[in-house]
């Protein structure tokens, strides 16, 4: 599938492509002749990028692989050979653990907002949404839940309330990806130079939403697929991650659908997601309290007082245990806040 071309008929500025002072501060005098380029598509054997001069197929050094790069990365490229000289440190990075894989898989980089897309049907799954939220929090992006297929649900408002209760100050938007009004509903996150990414199961409307957001800026629309009515499962219509221009001036990254997401190294993301539990942990009598049987446990006290949802606690425990098992080094007691600031930079 071809990439979209420039945002406008004229050459885009670096700011149009998502460049900011964060990346400019990383430039050195020796980089003066290199071209800042944003990775727009990652294939198994090649990369494509966008710069002020347009779309370019990029070359890699012999020791490098495409797996080292994510859509949204900023790289410095030699102008004649199109050889990638180095990658700039990421402002944010979305990555997921692949079942059976040796390490995390890069999903997208330098994303400002993560649209977590689900439907008002059998696809709606609280535990899965919490995993996506932990991923977004850890990455340093702003999560927004998008609810599709509300027109087919008996009580779409009930879905919205369930989603909004998952995390403090969480934005939830109900929309129909097929109508132009969907772009207007998301305009606050899709301004010039802003980058959003879509994540969710197959068949929830991600590719349709990409087409709506891109509008006339996209030359080759994303393929879309129907879902099976009996279980709300869809077909994979997106097989590669790619960067698309949004009609309003921003950028959107589509990702292949995923129904399973293992967590790893998302301690800060879990702490943010379950803030009501995180805030209770320092009040426990013992610093290494597991919140199961210890005397003076503030979490158990809140549970007995009815101010803490037992199902929420059970999901926190399951997610925390999985994260601890999958993370090579885990420091601090369960529930303690991560010492580092928000998000990862690599």
Curated annotation (Swiss-Prot):
Role according to the record: One of several proteins that assist in the late maturation steps of the functional core of the 30S ribosomal subunit. Helps release RbfA from mature subunits. May play a role in the assembly of ribosomal proteins into the subunit. Circularly permuted GTPase that catalyzes slow GTP hydrolysis, GTPase activity is stimulated by the 30S ribosomal subunit.
One BP term from GO: ribosomal small subunit biogenesis
UniProt keyword annotation of DNA-binding present: no
Gene3D superfamilies named among the record's database cross-references: P-loop containing nucleotide triphosphate hydrolases (3.40.50.300), Probable gtpase engc, domain 3 (1.10.40.50)
Region of interest (Disordered), ranges: 317-346
Binding note for cofactor: Binds 1 zinc ion per subunit.
InterPro entries hit by this protein: G_CP_dom, P-loop_NTPase, Ribosome_biogen_GTPase_RsgA, RsgA_GTPase_dom
Keywords, ordered alphabetically: Cytoplasm, GTP-binding, Hydrolase, Metal-binding, Nucleotide-binding, Ribosome biogenesis, RNA-binding, rRNA-binding, Zinc
Protein name: Small ribosomal subunit biogenesis GTPase RsgA
